[in-house]
Regions:
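Hydrophobic anchor at the beta1->P-loop junction of P-loop NTPases
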Residues: 4
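Conserved lysine of the Walker
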Residues: 12-13
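Short glycine-rich substrate-engagement loop in P-loop NTPases that contacts/grips substrate
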Residues: 35-66
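Conserved P-loop NTPase "ATPase switch" module shared by AAA+ and STAND
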Residues: 61-80
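Structural recognition of the conserved hydrophobic beta-strand(s) that form the central parallel beta-sheet
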Residues: 70, 94-100, 121, 130
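Conserved catalytic/switch belt of AAA+ P-loop NTPases
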Residues: 81-97, 102, 110-111
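Short regulatory helix/loop adjacent to the ATP-binding pocket of P-loop NTPases
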Residues: 86, 103-119, 133-135
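Interdomain hinge/linker elements that couple catalytic modules in large macromolecular machines
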Residues: 123, 128-213
Length: 213
């Protein structure tokens, strides 16, 4: 199993479809041998049941040829480890999965499939990758990169306001929520205040004891 990991919105899903899917098609793989499901889509909600997901894939894999199984947001499937272990026993299935949130941390999933899975780490854009799509000189590009980072979607926004709104949304509704869920934090307002304090002193040493007090 190939396990695609990385922070949210860094391009994990895009790596598999269209990039990897188009690579397979360009190299002669029959489209019927590519089984893809976006498990966070309402139209695929029934396949968040592990038994139904298993049955769906096996109904598609009708011969002994290799089938490429691409499962996006696998954490939506209850007890997804069990269905992935079942796929591992099928020699004609080449499985690729992505996942997000606290249920799918890299260390957890790699431990579960140690020796039976390969981790593919996806990162935000490097500066050179950012500059390959940035419309401007390197000095301005560096300032943009330092200020807004390398999440791929940032490169599609024109105004500073759009970029700031996008990043604030990711921080408040995605990243912080993952921390809250992972650590079972009940007072999320205190966490947000703590993050603001730490963010205001970037580049300075932070003393956990002082923060606690």
């Amino acid at each position: 199993i190939k396990i695609v990991t990385g922070i949210r919105r860094c391009g994990k899903s895009y790596l598999l479809d269209p990039i990897f899917k188009n690579y397979l098609l360009d190299n002669g793989v029959d489209e019927n041998h590519i089984i893809k499901l976006e498990l966070d889509s309402i139209e695929n909600e029934e396949y968040t049941n592990p038994k139904k997901l298993y049955e769906y894939v096996m109904e598609k894999a009708i011969d002994s040829d290799t089938y490429y199984v691409i499962l996006d947001e696998i954490q939506k499937v209850k007890d997804f480890e069990s269905v992935l272990n079942s796929f591992l026993r099928k020699p004609n299935l080449d499985v690729y999965v992505t996942g997000s949130n606290s249920k799918f941390l890299s260390s957890d999933i790699i431990t579960e499939f140690r020796g039976r899975g390969d981790e593919i780490k996806v990162y935000p854009l490097s500066f050179s990758e950012f500059m390959s799509v940035y419309k401007g000189n390197e000095i301005n590009g560096l300032n943009e990169y330092i200020n807004y980072g390398g999440l791929p979607l940032i490169t599609t926004f024109e105004s500073a306001e759009e970029k700031i709104d996008y990043l604030n949304f990711q921080k408040d509704n995605v990243y912080i929520n993952d921390v809250i869920e992972r650590n079972d934090i009940r007072n999320d307002e205190e966490l947000k205040t703590l993050i603001e304090i730490i963010s205001s002193s970037i580049g300075s040493l932070t003393n956990p004891t002082k923060l606690y007090n």
